[in-house]
């Protein structure tokens, strides 16, 4: 069975699904407070001059894990610059990541991790993926878990989307995220000192 697609890859079935959801949401009287909080964070990030945060990333390859810590700064255009802080053997490596890719700079050190999720993401790009998803991903759900707001967000509207579970803490700022591909956690991000500029 063939489905006709519009430019950009949206099939008629997906378009119909989006229209039905939009009609149902129009009938809602106030929206979910949890969704409102998630969308408020998105609005703040989109309107801001950027943000800064520290993150510890763990990449899970199934048979092996790698953990490293980075300091990150996102500018008003969504470009993320980072510097590796730990482990000491790769500390000082820095780079920039944006929609077009990334660039690393280093002295006598190399930061090389295999690709994850069928070549969609590298561990070093995980903080940029978190920011990109918070500012423009498809919000699937939100639930309160004790003092944390747990969001499920797809990084895109595509069939091969990565799913991010994001936990917001005090001030509705991110404190943790997990990136899943085909229902398997491939990346864990522990976020500290998140500040919107």
Enumerate the language-model features and the residues they cover:
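Sec-dependent bacterial lipoprotein signal peptides
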Residues: 1-26
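Beta-strand elements of well-folded, non-transmembrane domains
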Residues: 57-61, 74-78, 86-88, 168-170, ...
